[in-house]
Amino acid sequence: MKIVADENLAFTDYFFSEFGDIQHKAGRTLTHTDVQDAEALLVRSVTAVNESLIQNTALKYVGSATIGTDHLDIQALEKQGITWANAAGCNAQAVAEYVITALLHLDASLLEQQEKFTLGIVGLGNVGKRLAYMAQLLGWKVIGFDPFVQLDSIENVSFQTLLQQANAVSIHVPLTKKGEHATYHLFDEKAFAALQPNTILINSARGPVVKEAALIEDIQCTQRKVVLDVFEHEPVISEGLLNMLALATPHIAGYSLEGKARGTQMIYEAFCQKFGYDINKRFETQLPACEDYFSGHDLKAVLKQKLSQIYDIAQYDANIRACVKEGKVEQKAFDLLRKNYPLRREWAAHGGPQA
């Protein structure tokens, strides 16, 4: 069997080498010719799996090691009779930890604020519910908005109420353009007008959920602290926008070693189900041991002392800013940052909590 895999997928050889010949390719530039005689295709979100890519191929299975599916033309896949799978929730823990790390980097005193600090979570799926749990471990008040999901553990509110009451808003919705609850440009001029000027905004979901022109106008008016891991016009980022952001990272909020490995394992399991193979591999066997920071210690004390060692978010903010040339970060530089990003470990690897 020929298997074509994105060259940046983690542990592909460990999970798939026994099944056939793996060809590693650059995901963003994958062509019909690359996949024509392949039976399985393994991708990330940078590959648009559409009709022109998959028609008249030998493909029987497409696995995407990602939470989202907006890069997959599911209708075209099903029309061609190709089984598909994604890895919903694979890096949800990593994204939740990214958000808390970003907030504590911007304001370390949040560790002491308990319920005086209100975190508003937009989207209560795999990431949102984990973030809610982790935030509550720190004593924060959590409110959430999701038209499809209600969490018993938090206060569920309307979108408008969340915007008005939250001290920080974190976005965790898929990108949708149709229907009553479409998320494209959910954060537009009207949404920004409802936010308090000192409310922190974090987007680690999908870039176009935030209307960039409205965001720029809002920051100019309010000096709002904004953290972006995703961008409306990604992978190109303007220097003007970058200079306005409190923190910027190149779409790596979910890039933990555990998250990457978990994503590949999930599409491996779906692959095995499709082709009738036994599922007998676990990503945990491939991960090196880490220094234990948390066991037997107070959570907040450890975060105060060790957070930058667990994940030095400021370094990766500096890295993306260093890539600016002629007024912008180009696609090639953006992709290189992602490819060369050293995968951090989740808190649980250091003996810490996990949602």
Swiss-Prot record:
Domain of life: Bacteria
EC numbers, comma separated: 1.1.1.290
Reactions listed under catalytic activity: 4-phospho-D-erythronate + NAD(+) = (R)-3-hydroxy-2-oxo-4-phosphooxybutanoate + NADH + H(+)
This protein's UniProt keywords: Cytoplasm, NAD, Oxidoreductase, Pyridoxine biosynthesis
GO molecular function: 4-phosphoerythronate dehydrogenase activity; NAD binding; protein dimerization activity
Sites where the protein binds substrate: 45, 66, 255
GO annotation (BP), single: pyridoxine biosynthetic process
Binding locations of NAD(+): 146, 229, 254
UniProt pathway annotation: Cofactor biosynthesis; pyridoxine 5'-phosphate biosynthesis; pyridoxine 5'-phosphate from D-erythrose 4-phosphate: step 2/5
InterPro entries: D-iso_2-hydroxyacid_DH_PdxB, D-isomer_2_OHA_DH_cat_dom, D-isomer_DH_CS1, D-isomer_DH_NAD-bd, Erythronate-4-P_DHase, Erythronate-4-P_DHase_dimer, NAD(P)-bd_dom_sf, PdxB_dimer_sf
GO cellular component: cytoplasm
Active-site residue numbers: 206, 234, 251
EC class of the enzyme, as a word: oxidoreductase
Tagged with keyword Cytoplasm: yes
A UniProt-annotated Pfam family: DUF3410
Major location (coarse): cytoplasm
Subcellular location: Cytoplasm
Family from the record: Belongs to the D-isomer specific 2-hydroxyacid dehydrogenase family. PdxB subfamily.
Role played: Catalyzes the oxidation of erythronate-4-phosphate to 3-hydroxy-2-oxo-4-phosphonooxybutanoate.
Quaternary data: Homodimer.
Family annotation (PANTHER family): D-ISOMER SPECIFIC 2-HYDROXYACID DEHYDROGENASE CATALYTIC DOMAIN-CONTAINING PROTEIN-RELATED, D-ISOMER SPECIFIC 2-HYDROXYACID DEHYDROGENASE FAMILY PROTEIN (AFU_ORTHOLOGUE AFUA_1G13630)
Name of protein: Erythronate-4-phosphate dehydrogenase
Organism from which the protein derives: Acinetobacter baumannii (strain SDF)
